[in-house]
Amino acid sequence: MADVKVAGRSFSGNGRIDELMQSWGFYPDSYLYIMEGVPVPSDTVISDDEKVDAVRVASGG
């Protein structure tokens, strides 16, 4: 399974990043996803041995 790090915690799963994040109780649009130092879209499909860092973003005025 792929490893996704969110707010200092690790989660495992295979599938679309946004769907996995939602299943773990996070709002997928609130994060930027980084794989191997490169930003990737939230609809990226991840699988075995891949690593993703989810970085919380802030917006507003």
Q: What do these predicted ranges mean?
A:
Residues 1-60:
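Ubiquitin-like/PB1-type beta-grasp interaction modules and other compact soluble beta-rich domains
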